[in-house]
């Protein structure tokens, strides 16, 4: 399935509520900062237990439109990586005209 701006995907939100923000990670190989995103709520929930979260912080899976996520991510120097329920990267989404490595 092709993702477009109105496709609903799922992300992990840190500190849900007034100070919430998307949960981000850094790719160990490329040192690229990215927001992990998922095609299903179940995949996001399954993967959350495997991610390096901070003790004392709250995390919540939320739906977001793909276009809103990529605009926010790219505007804050993050990329978007699609993950499966086991945390494997299935797709790397870089901003248009990015010099980022595509491997």
Features from the language model and the residues they span:
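Conserved NAD+-utilizing ADP-ribose enzyme module
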Residues: 1-103
């Amino acid at each position: 399935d092709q993702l477009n701006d109105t496709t609903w995907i799922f992300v992990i939100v840190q500190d849900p509520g007034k100070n919430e923000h998307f949960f981000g990670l850094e790719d160990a190989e490329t040192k690229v900062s990215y927001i992990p995103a998922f095609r299903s709520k179940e995949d996001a929930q399954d993967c959350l237990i495997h991610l390096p979260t901070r003790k004392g912080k709250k995390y919540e899976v939320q739906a977001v439109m793909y276009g809103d996520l990529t605009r926010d991510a790219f505007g804050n120097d993050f990329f978007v990586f699609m993950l499966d329920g086991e945390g494997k990267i299935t797709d790397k989404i870089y901003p248009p005209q990015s010099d980022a490595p595509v491997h």
